[in-house]
Amino acid sequence: GDILFDEEFAKKNKESITSARNLLADDLSVKVFDNILEFYKTGELSLLDGITTDKDEAFSLLSLGENETYVDLGAYNGDTVDEFLNYTNGKYKFITALEPNAKNYSKLQAHCSEMKNLELWQLGAYSHNTTLCFNNKAGRNSAIVNESNTKTPVAAVDTILCGRAATYVKADVEGADFETILGMKNTLKMFKPKLNFSAYHRFEDIFRLPLLISGIN
């Protein structure tokens, strides 16, 4: 985002930062949170030593089973569907995958053509159903921008699922994480799915995303 994470910003958001920190359930999570905030302020790379984890560790926390109803927001060419299947022994109940970029979506369709119990949408995820400008030249990092010749439809997860269950939601929505969560309030309340979201696109997401999710639940 355009925000500068400095002492003034930290002071202004102290209450929210403290509230988000208090939601964390273990010492390592608190250390990660504290070190990342300090890294944002100072840019000191050594603060990231000892707080990074590999994908296997992250997925061990998610503890995915063989009967998941998976929602993939930003499925690119199908690589994250494959990643999901890798951790569920290739088994699942249902997959809903969204990809806004036309070229990527064609690859996704081809990649998943033999799969059953799956639906694909050429859409981006957002807080509500609308049309937004996308920078589609960024490949897997296609993102919402203020001005572009490429208009892309986006939709709320709640609208797409229409009350159907979700047990695991992964989002790669390039900075629209807050809006995406707003668009899945009903899904979160009803099914409390496991979430795999990014909190690095905007400085403030590290505290505002946990607070938003906690407030909904």
Task: Describe the residue ranges of each PLM region.
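Phosphate/nucleotide-binding beta-alpha loop and adjacent structural elements of enzyme active sites
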Residues: G1-N217
